Design a protein with these regions (language model features):
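Conserved catalytic network of the ASCE P-loop NTPase/AAA+ motor domain
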Residues: 3, 48-53, 71-76, 124-126
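ATP-dependent small-molecule kinase phosphotransfer cores
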Residues: 1-57, 61-65
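Switch/connector loops and helix/strand junctions flanking conserved nucleotide-binding motifs
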Residues: 2-3, 67-68, 88-94, 142-144
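Conserved beta-strand scaffold positions in the cores of enzyme catalytic domains, especially
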Residues: 10-12, 27-30, 78-82, 131-133
């Protein structure tokens, strides 16, 4: 995507490198999104950056990522901070971000919105064991609530 640099936020590798990491048991979680532009693959690698024996880590991911992280690290090691936004507001924000792109891809925005409705369904939230939700209506209030709860851990 425009503006992304290798090693800043993401690391980009080819299929062969990904398969080698899988064979070596280094892939913590992976998923593929069938986008308008073709499949996009994302994964998290155990490269030593996440050291739960001595540090805490914050990762941003989907329910699928959360479930895979629990399987890899153990359920007692992973605490969900489920942030939700009302559908209309989420769509408004996504549309505003897309309009800022040099070449907005509204078809992909719509695909992602519909996919998210399935990926974050009430059924999947329940299956993941998510008990607490943070509503991101007022950003500052949402952040204060999250910070308060994180301090408990």
């Amino acid at each position: 995507r425009k503006g992304e640099e290798n090693g800043v936020g993401y690391y980009f590798v080819d299929q062969a490198a990904y398969e080698k990491m899988c064979q070596n048991g280094k892939v913590i979680e992976s998923r593929t999104y069938e986008t308008i532009n073709g499949p996009w693959h994302y994964f998290t690698v155990d490269d030593g950056q996440i050291r739960l024996d001595r540090d805490n880590a914050i990762l941003i991911g989907t329910l699928e990522v959360y479930n895979q992280m629990k399987r890899y690290f153990g359920e007692e090691q992973v605490v969900p901070l489920y942030i939700e936004v009302e559908d209309g507001l989420r769509l408004e924000r996504a549309l505003a971000r897309e309009r800022m792109q040099d070449v907005p891809n509204y078809a992909e925005l719509c695909r992602r919105y519909l996919a998210d409705r399935q990926d974050f369904s009430e059924e999947k939230i329940a299956e993941a064991g998510i008990l607490k939700r943070y509503e991101n209506i007022d950003f500052d209030a949402c952040c204060r609530e999250i910070v308060r709860d994180v301090k408990i851990f």
